[in-house]
Curated annotation (Swiss-Prot):
Gene designation: ndhB
GO cellular component: chloroplast thylakoid membrane
Biological role: NDH shuttles electrons from NAD(P)H:plastoquinone, via FMN and iron-sulfur (Fe-S) centers, to quinones in the photosynthetic chain and possibly in a chloroplast respiratory chain. The immediate electron acceptor for the enzyme in this species is believed to be plastoquinone. Couples the redox reaction to proton translocation, and thus conserves the redox energy in a proton gradient.
Name this protein carries in UniProt: NAD(P)H-quinone oxidoreductase subunit 2, chloroplastic
Compartments, record wording: Plastid, Chloroplast thylakoid membrane
Subunit note: NDH is composed of at least 16 different subunits, 5 of which are encoded in the nucleus.
Membrane topology: Multi-pass membrane protein
Catalytic reaction equation(s): a plastoquinone + NADH + (n+1) H(+)(in) = a plastoquinol + NAD(+) + n H(+)(out); a plastoquinone + NADPH + (n+1) H(+)(in) = a plastoquinol + NADP(+) + n H(+)(out)
Keyword Calcium listed: no
Top-level taxonomic group: Eukaryota
Native species: Chaetosphaeridium globosum (Charophycean green alga)
Length: 500
């Protein structure tokens, strides 16, 4: 019998990176059930190698020939490859950030790895999903794994509460999005492939505009929950505060990356054929997201909640590139998302390391950290300055490219709001830096006074430090090499958007 290289309309080579991770997931499950706990630590290396191999195959596929299939439910184009690669980076760094934390917490490492791989696989499929069924299935795979990760610390009441809130809000947002998809299915004459839906919408001009507005609103609300846009952000601070810190680090970048890829694909493909006013609606959401996220972040006393509201504001910046609906706009969102992964995971890495040594994440407890642990304080300073958009770090150039693309697209008010709120964000980032660099011993927090000074070494002492070093180098070097990165992003978008 002839061996087919196509399964349900998906070229098998296209999903080879996901297949590697599925193999790692199944292997981890089998080993977890068959071996004693003391013999399972090496499985971390297997999954790390699997993530690296998956990323390498994505690099080999980039800018290659896009497979043509009879039922293209999944697209392996350069656009999806770029975002899937970002998710691989986020997962790999999150795994490194998690190992020491989980060992200290005394919970099952294998379960965490299984949930992490499940979320990674769901996010990667979501980046290339090209029909309504695949989109919703991938979204639920990512969502269910994320809910389990949020409630991973079963003995922690806050973690259980975070998982419950995340489940309820995530389920509601998925239901709203599915309702919007059902209207889209009807308007297009029963089509589920995105390109075929567009063909159906072209001939749906006779439909009542109210129905189109209902469809548009439901989809925007559903996507808004996924990327934590205001006013659909209420779940984010509570879930971030209650979930284990490594889980928060992963959710803050991986789910946002997958949500951004889905949003761009739907907006570039379908929205122009629904209503012309969608840009105005998204501009209002983007302005609210940037303003609320940054203003509320100023009042926070917990590093995790502060980074949660910072993550909300970053979603507003990313929306500038999406709303511009230009090649440079989409490319700027991709570039900033890649930079954001490193600087945000690096900041969370510092919070994790400080928490492992002190047991707290309150901002005031970082007081005087520089004199006790200058390396950790310097790393956190670099990440916060990059998040604030201070040169010469990568975050500055990423924001400049975003704002430039918005200005070129005529989004003057939105760009001005972005610049203004970016200046506001510098205040609360610098406030934390100022607290760390106090020199008076009487101003030191009790946690810093009892801080165990680590052994000085040129080599990282833990997986958390390894991930932090990678993020710190990336946050610094990417600012210097920003032009090649922008060129790669532009090439990715130019080769994809006409066929997205």
């Amino acid at each position: 019998m002839e061996i087919q290289n196509n399964l349900y309309g998906i070229d098998l080579y296209t999903i080879l990176p996901e297949s590697i991770l599925i193999f790692c997931l199944l292997t981890t499950l089998i080993i977890d059930l068959s071996l004693d706990s003391k013999n399972k630590s090496w499985i971390i290396y297997l999954n790390t190698i699997g993530l690296i191999l998956s990323g390498l195959f994505l690099c080999l596929q980039w800018n290659g020939i896009i497979p043509v299939t009879p039922f293209p439910s999944f697209k392996g184009d350069s656009f999806s490859i770029a975002f899937r690669f970002c998710i691989i980076i986020a997962s790999l760094l999150s795994l490194l950030l998690s190992i020491d934390y989980i060992k200290r917490a005394g919970v099952q490492l294998m379960e965490f790895v299984i949930f992490l791989l499940g979320a990674t696989i769901g996010g990667m499929f979501l980046c290339g999903a090209n029909d309504l069924i695949t989109i919703f299935t991938s979204l639920e795979c990512l969502g269910l794994s994320s809910y389990l990760l949020a409630g991973y610390s079963k003995q922690d009441i806050r973690s259980n509460e975070a998982a419950m809130k995340y489940l309820l809000v995530g389920g509601a947002s998925s239901a709203i999005l599915a309702y919007g998809f059902s209207w889209l299915y009807g308007l297009s004459g029963g089509k589920i492939i995105l390109s075929e839906i567009v063909d159906g919408l072209i001939f749906a001009d006779f439909v009542n505009p109210l129905i189109k507005w209902i469809t548009l609103t439901c989809i925007i609300v559903g996507l808004g929950f996924k990327i934590s846009a205001v006013p659909f952000h209420q779940w984010t601070p509570d879930v971030y505060e209650g979930s284990p810190t490594p889980v928060v680090a992963f959710l803050s970048v991986a789910s946002k990356t997958a949500g951004l890829a889905l949003t761009i694909r739907i907006i570039a493909t379908i929205f122009p054929y629904l209503e012309n006013e969608w840009q105005f609606l998204l501009q209002i959401l983007a302005c609210l997201t940037m303003i609320v996220g940054n203003l509320v972040a100023i009042t926070q006393t917990s590093m995790k909640r502060m980074l949660a509201y910072s993550s909300i504001s970053q979603a507003g910046y990313l929306m500038i590139g999406i709303i511009s609906s230009t090649n440079d706009g989409y490319a700027s969102s991709l570039v900033y998302m890649l930079i954001y992964i490193f600087m945000n995971l690096g900041a969370f890495g510092c919070v994790i390391l400080f928490g492992l040594r002190t047991g707290t994440d309150q901002i005031r407890d970082f007081s005087g950290l520089y004199l006790k642990d200058p390396w950790l304080a310097s790393c956190l300073t670099i990440f916060l300055l990059s998040l604030g958009g201070i040169p010469p770090f990568a975050g500055f150039f990423g924001k400049i490219y975003l704002f430039w693309s918005g200005w070129q697209a005529g989004l003057y008010i939105l760009t001005f709001v972005g610049l203004l709120t970016s200046v506001i964000s510098i205040y609360y980032y610098l406030r934390i830096i100022k607290i760390m660099f106090v020199r008076e011993a009487k101003e030191f927090s009790s946690y810093v006074k009892n801080y165990v000074i680590p052994v000085n070494s040129l080599l990282p002492q833990s997986s958390v430090e390894t991930a932090m070093i990678v993020c710190m180098i990336a946050s610094s070097v990417m600012g210097i090499a920003i032009n090649p990165i922008i060129q790669v992003a532009q090439k990715t978008i130019l080769s994809t958007i006409p066929f997205i």
